[in-house]
Amino acid sequence: MECSATPPKLYPTVDTSTTVAPLPKSSSSSSSTNNNNLYPSINVNDLVNNIFPDPTASDSASAPPLATEEVILTIHGAMVHLIDKSYSVELACGDLEILRLVQGDITVAVFARVGDEIQWPLTKDEPAVKVDESHYFFSLRPVKESESSDHSVNETENEMLNYGLTMASKGQEPMLEKLDKILADYSSFTAEEKQKEENVLDLTAAKETSPEELKGKRKKMVEKQCTAYWTTLAPNVEDYSGVAAKLIAAGSGQLIKGILWCGDLTMDRLMWGNDFMKKKLSKAEKERQVSPGTLKRLKRVKKMTKMTEKVANGVLSGVVKVSGFFSSSVINSKAGQKLFGLLPGEMVLATLDGFNKVCDAVEVAGRHVMKTTSDVTTEIVDHKYGAKTAQATNEGLSAAGHAFGTAWTVFKIRQALNPKSAMKPSSLAKTVVKTAAKERKKGKKSSK
């Protein structure tokens, strides 16, 4: 057997003569080697040009938008009074400006300002009422002082600041329509309506005065009449604001006029109001003595203006503190908690639309009273003065007056009235008076 035979190989033989060594990358060889490349080519132009944005652009986008102050409305010939039973004090006279603080696309706060002296916030938890073509009033709960924590409930209710706004409305009707729209958007606004044949208070000076005339000889006459006007309506405004604050705190953004403004013998009360107005006008010069309570309210007015200015400056500088503007009852209520949770850290201007939340009993009873009462008016003056002239100075309760100025809430009204039964005005009055009397007794016991 021959030994020259080669043993079989375990691996196949590789022909290295056809292997091409890798060539360096060049423009000339890229086209020739494109077919031999195992991976697809990548075009750099198809990639995103700048995956990471410029750091300066990132910083500017994350910064909070700059807050600005906008004047959305200016009306000439405005006069503001602090409404008081003894003597309504004039606070300022000049141009009315509605200011809006805006941060980006968000409205942070809205203020009303007259001249450079008085300024107050417009919020959905504070009532604003249009009495007629020339008169508005605003009810504000002032910033609580530390030493007032031990005051009684009645004293706390009397701490409401009521501002009476009088406009020289001659020739400014379109501007006042804009004002009504703004108040409807940013406050708990109610426009009262009166019948054409009714003239609650014989006061037409403001309506027949233009802003130019207010700067001349007519100014003194208008000032006297406005002081008398707001002093006359002071009891009604205080009762109204007390009820409005309670209903708003319970989740209602609007009062039901059928209940709050119902009453008999309307003409007697209108005559009483006109006589009272004439007396105030004839004695306006003598009634210059301001009560101690009025002096305290004047101090609170200044504090409210200063607080409003602080908030405006805080918003413009990026630091906002607004809790002082809202009463604790609103903050602690369920509706208030939902409201304040909408825009944390901002002055809340969201809607507290509570008309649908008011119980059906009040609506049904209110509509029934409106239909069955012989003479019903929606004027402020009718809210206080009772069924007879002799009851005007009486401390007794009536269906259209004091009964709704007590410590009522919408939930107690629901318990007092039955919506399924057709209630007469007399039975409504009895129910209201009984409930109000119980509340007054409880208040006296607690004060003792």
Swiss-Prot record:
Keyword annotations of the record: Chloroplast, Plastid, Transit peptide
Compartments where found: Plastid, Chloroplast
Region (Disordered): 1-36, 422-448
Record flagged with keyword Magnesium: no
UniProt feature, compositional bias: Basic residues: 439-448
Tissue expression: Expressed in leaves (especially in midribs and trichomes), apical meristemic regions, stems, roots and flowers.
Transit peptide endpoints, chain numbering: 1-56
Keyword Protein biosynthesis: no
Feature: compositional bias, Low complexity: 26-36
Main location: plastid
GO biological process: response to cold; response to oomycetes; response to salt stress
Protein's name according to its UniProt entry: Senescence/dehydration-associated protein At4g35985, chloroplastic
Gene symbol of the encoding locus: P85
